[in-house]
């Protein structure tokens, strides 16, 4: 009976170690996924910011052209 317990105990211990390693790997993958999501958010916000800055610049240029036209009365 004692000779059967040793292999069974070994199998249980190896299973626990394997499960622990899988959980650690899964946690690492989840952290990596969160980092990727943050990078996507940053790139998306950067793109939106660049678009808004470009739109603001073009709007300011058109307003300045209109004002200079009215001030110089060249319209």
UniProtKB/Swiss-Prot annotation:
Expressing tissues: Expressed by the skin glands.
Localization terms from the record: Secreted
One GO term (biological process): defense response to Gram-positive bacterium
Residues making up the signal peptide according to the UniProt record: 1-22
Propeptide: 23-40
InterPro entries noted in UniProt: Antimicrobial_frog_2, Frog_antimicrobial_propeptide
Pfam families reported for this sequence: Antimicrobial_2, FSAP_sig_propep
Keywords linked to the UniProt accession: Amphibian defense peptide, Antibiotic, Antimicrobial, Cleavage on pair of basic residues, Cytolysis, Disulfide bond, Fungicide, Hemolysis, Secreted, Signal
Source superkingdom: Eukaryota
Disulfide bonds: 69-75
Family: Belongs to the frog skin active peptide (FSAP) family. Brevinin subfamily.
Free-text function comment from the UniProt entry: Has antimicrobial activity against some Gram-positive bacteria and fungi but has no activity against a range of Gram-negative bacteria except P.faecalis. Has antimicrobial activity against the Gram-positive bacteria S.aureus ATCC 25923 (MIC=19 uM), B.licheniformis X39 (MIC=37.5 uM) and R.rhodochrous X15 (MIC=9.5 uM), is virtually inactive against E.faecium 091299 (MIC=150 uM) and S.carnosus KHS (MIC=150 uM) and inactive against E.faecalis 981. Active against the Gram-negative bacterium P.faecalis X29 (MIC=9.5 uM) and is inactive against E.coli, P.aeruginosa and S.typhi.
Protein name: Brevinin-2HS2B
Species annotation: Odorrana hainanensis (Odor frog)
